[in-house]
A protein has these predicted regions:
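Short, solvent-exposed linear motifs at loop/edge-of-secondary-structure regions
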Residues: 19-29
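N-terminal compositionally biased, intrinsically disordered segments and leader/signal-like regions
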Residues: 15, 19, 37, 49, ...
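Beta-sandwich interaction modules
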Residues: 16-18, 50-63, 79
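Surface-exposed ligand/attachment interfaces on beta-rich extracellular proteins
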Residues: 5-21, 41-43
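Short, surface-exposed beta-strand/strand-loop-strand elements in extracellular ectodomains
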Residues: 28-46
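Noncatalytic modules at the cell exterior or secretory-pathway interfaces
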Residues: 23-25, 57-71
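Exposed low-complexity, polar/acidic, P/S/T/G-rich flexible segments that act as propeptides
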Residues: 71-80
Length: 80
């Protein structure tokens, strides 16, 4: 079991957002969405999230995340 600790308020968006410059974020997709991570350092990447799913995403602080539908995200820390 993984314990997740929210570090900030959850925010919802579709356009590019750094999510408080966080390194680890919890992402919730209320509808099917293609999620894109944009980076100045690494190649841009993307993945698909199905409706009602949650993923943990690790990124660099300046990297942005965006979705084709609204994403609800919050910075987190975790303990395995």
């Amino acid at each position: 079991m993984m314990i997740i600790k929210p570090l900030q308020e959850e925010i919802s968006f579709t356009s590019a957002n750094t999510v408080y410059d966080a390194r680890l974020i919890r992402v919730y997709a209320a509808a099917n969405s293609v999620v894109t991570i944009a980076s100045d350092v690494n190649a841009n990447t993307s993945f698909t999230m199905h409706q009602g799913t949650v993923e943990l995403v690790e990124k660099l602080p300046a990297d942005t995340i965006a979705g084709t539908t609204t994403l609800a995200c919050t910075p987190v820390s975790y303990k395995a």
